[in-house]
Amino acid sequence: MVKAVFPGSFDPLTFGHLDVISRSALLFDQVIVAVGINTSKTAMFTTEEKITLISNNTKNLKNVSVLPMPDLTFKFVSSVGADVIVRGIRNVRDYEYERDIAEINHRLGNVDTVLLPSKAVYQDISSSNLKEVAKFGADISHFVPENVIKLIKLKTK
């Protein structure tokens, strides 16, 4: 049985994230979506809100669970007994960044990373950009689920 961890800040959850989760669910026996904190960004949602949003949008995927990740990724992977880390990549910049992080996780935690290229339709989706345009009332329904839109609207009133 191969267990994978898909870590991220998911602030907000996008259709690109959901695509990586659903594709991972087909590839691995168990997928843990690990909700971490990105200290270099200001979060719009709490960890609990993110867990609820992800859980509600993945409830049809029986081999997917969602947990908070209070630690470094390689430590979390070890603590849940996972075999690999999964990351989505949209472009060359993502690849270079993820390759470097994968090397660190391998050296420190002896864990491999599987990189899933984004489908073309999701390559331009950036959580940071979506938060910014949503603050000004732009329609982001092509990029995020409806429950995410509702929560963004509540938070940006």
From Swiss-Prot:
Gene3D superfamilies: HUPs
Coiled-coil regions, chain positions: none
A Gene Ontology BP annotation from the UniProt entry: coenzyme A biosynthetic process
Binding site for substrate: S9, K41, T73, R87
InterPro entries reported for this sequence: Cyt_trans-like, PPAT, Rossmann-like_a/b/a_fold
Nucleotide-binding listed as a keyword: yes
Molecular function terms from GO: ATP binding; pantetheine-phosphate adenylyltransferase activity
EC numbers, comma separated: 2.7.7.3
Top EC class of this enzyme: transferase
Protein location: Cytoplasm
Keyword Magnesium: yes
Transmembrane segments: none
Reported cofactor(s): Mg(2+)
Catalytic activity: (R)-4'-phosphopantetheine + ATP + H(+) = 3'-dephospho-CoA + diphosphate
Pathway(s) of this molecule: Cofactor biosynthesis; coenzyme A biosynthesis; CoA from (R)-pantothenate: step 4/5
Record-marked site positions (Transition state stabilizer): H17
Residue numbers binding ATP: S9, F10, H17, G88, I89, R90, E98, Y122, Q123, D124, I125, S126, S127, S128
Keywords noted in UniProt: ATP-binding, Coenzyme A biosynthesis, Cytoplasm, Magnesium, Nucleotide-binding, Nucleotidyltransferase, Transferase
Listed GO CC annotations: cytoplasm
NCBIfam families to which the protein is assigned, alphabetical: coaD_prev_kdtB, cyt_tran_rel
Family in the record: Belongs to the bacterial CoaD family.
Protein's job: Reversibly transfers an adenylyl group from ATP to 4'-phosphopantetheine, yielding dephospho-CoA (dPCoA) and pyrophosphate.
Complex formation: Homohexamer.
Name of the molecule in the record: Phosphopantetheine adenylyltransferase
Organism: Oenococcus oeni (strain ATCC BAA-331 / PSU-1)
Gene: coaD
